[in-house]
């Protein structure tokens, strides 16, 4: 058993023709086991996920009433403050659940009632075709049955 603990791998020397070929081709050595075990340096980025200055969108003001860059920065700051206030956990550590606001039946149907005339026409045609197809099925069922004796019982 002690022989197993002393086993190690020794990488043989690379032949000269292979090293010459790699040099001619400009071969770059791939990652090895040791390089994969190395820890990557941690990037020092903001943890809040904010964009860097050069990655932020460019603000173009066309009219007097448009938002300026300063206004956008103020709004972003207010949003960050609001989210921090909402995310703050209670001091006693208990999680509190809020009851959802009940919706009135009129509120949910008010947006759904706005329907185009094209959709109404399609629904009407579907209903009329549904009655016609049921009549056709009755006629076809008598024509297509092969065992009339089984159904006459």
Curated annotation (Swiss-Prot):
Compositionally biased residues, Polar residues: 106-116, 130-144
Segments of this protein annotated with the region Disordered? 30-66, 79-153
InterPro entries, per database record: DUF4604 (IPR027911), KIAA1143-like (IPR040219)
Acidic residues bias spans? 45-56
Q: Write down what this protein is called.
A: Uncharacterized protein KIAA1143 homolog
Identify the species of origin.
Answer: Xenopus laevis
């Amino acid at each position: 058993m002690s022989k197993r603990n002393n086993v190690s791998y020794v990488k043989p020397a690379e032949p000269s023709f292979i090293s010459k070929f790699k040099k001619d081709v400009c071969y770059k050595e791939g990652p090895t086991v040791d390089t994969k075990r190395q820890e990557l340096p941690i990037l020092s980025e903001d943890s809040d996920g904010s964009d860097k200055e050069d990655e932020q969108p460019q603000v173009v003001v066309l009219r007097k009433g448009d938002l300026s860059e300063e206004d956008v920065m103020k709004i972003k700051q207010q949003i960050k403050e609001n989210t921090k206030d909402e995310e703050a956990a209670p001091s006693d550590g208990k999680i509190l659940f809020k009851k959802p606001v009940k919706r009135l039946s009129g509120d949910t149907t008010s947006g759904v009632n706005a329907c185009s005339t094209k959709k109404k026409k399609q629904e009407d045609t579907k209903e009329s075709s549904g009655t016609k197809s049921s009549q056709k099925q009755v006629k076809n069922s008598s024509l297509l049955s092969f065992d009339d004796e089984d159904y006459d019982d």
